Regions:
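Glycine-rich, proline-tolerant flexible connector loops at the mouths of alpha/beta enzymes
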Residues: 55, 73-99, 130-141, 145-149
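Short, well-ordered coil/turn segments that N-cap beta-strands
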Residues: 45-48, 75-77, 100-105, 122-124, ...
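Active-site mouth loops of central-metabolism enzymes
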Residues: 45-63, 82, 105-111
Length: 173
């Protein structure tokens, strides 16, 4: 049967992925440990999980909640929202509240580590790109570092990242 909804392309794709995943393949999974995103267990003996990304504006609460419900009905087990700033974090908190635990939410963050810190307090998972995690100016220029400068930059990233990890631990993100 075909699941029809306003977001049909997303839903059909999720069903196709689910059907494909149920086929026995010769693929051997690597041994991993279990991690949890909300009430969802990932890794080790658990199946590969279906995640999709909302294409609504995160600040449009009503459309985002509607799309999330459609995606869950189609088989999505995790739902990612773009989170550009603090306004989107506030919107994610409202979306999370409206969905009432229906699906774990993921904040997709680039460039703004302070936004990641705030999002980690309202959703089940935060996705960052370490390559642009602390680059708020979005300067994609090539820089030739000395070994000392390179190590200092790594230490700066490490220190900032540890702060996020501690927030995630505190909030079980």
């Amino acid at each position: 049967s075909i699941f029809y909804c306003e977001y049909q392309n997303i839903c059909v794709t999720l069903h196709q992925i689910r059907a494909f995943m149920n086929i026995t393949l010769t693929y051997q999974r690597r041994q991993t440990t279990t991690t949890h995103v909300g009430g969802l267990s990932i890794g080790s003996k658990f199946p590969v999980r279906i995640q999709t990304m909302a294409n609504t504006s995160t600040n449009n609460i009503e459309d985002s909640v509607t799309q999330a419900k459609h995606c869950v009905a189609a088989g999505s087990e995790l739902l990612r929202f773009t989170t550009q700033g603090m306004r989107e974090v506030e919107s994610l908190a409202l979306i999370h509240q409206a969905l009432d635990g229906m699906v774990p939410l993921v904040a997709d963050i680039h460039f703004q580590s302070d936004v990641a810190d705030a999002a980690a307090q309202v959703v089940e998972k935060v996705r960052i790109n370490p390559g642009n995690y602390i680059d708020p100016a979005r300067k994609f220029k090539q820089i030739d570092y000395t070994e000392e400068e390179y190590q200092a930059e790594l230490e700066r990233l490490r220190n900032r990242f540890v702060l996020l990890i501690n927030i995630c631990k505190e909030h079980k993100t």
